């Protein structure tokens, strides 16, 4: 188990999302209530994939203790790449296993769900996602949480991709993973806090 005095959580939000996502806010609030507010980070990830990775890597480089990643949707895709590259653990919530394929169909103008800020998602960004594909994963690194009713992603891709990892599969639900509050204690425990 990680040293509780130093363990940290880095939350990576999904496409068109932000630190204002309800899951990020709830996790941050629960950690603050437990006295760990200073151990939680959720940056605003740029819509450009390589810039998002650079942002996360900068935070990892500054971390004073072991960091566990928590990634939702596209954030789960990023968390996988970072976990394998930097020997970290990660909690994945309805991860975008096939992000280049999924987002390849979304080239164009988008608005952030929380800020309303618009941005262009381009074919170059899809190529950057392809460059972040991770050929294999180390199952022991991961806690996977998926909803079978995810309307955006096929949850079975995640089950296959992270076979052998600790998996929580819920019937129904949707891409937002509405039962997230029930699993916050397990997430915090997995993260070593």
Give short role names for the model-derived ranges.
Residues 61, 65-67, 88, 93:
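Internal catalytic or translocation cores that form aromatic/hydrophobic pockets or channels
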Residues 65-68, 141-143:
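Short active-site oxyanion
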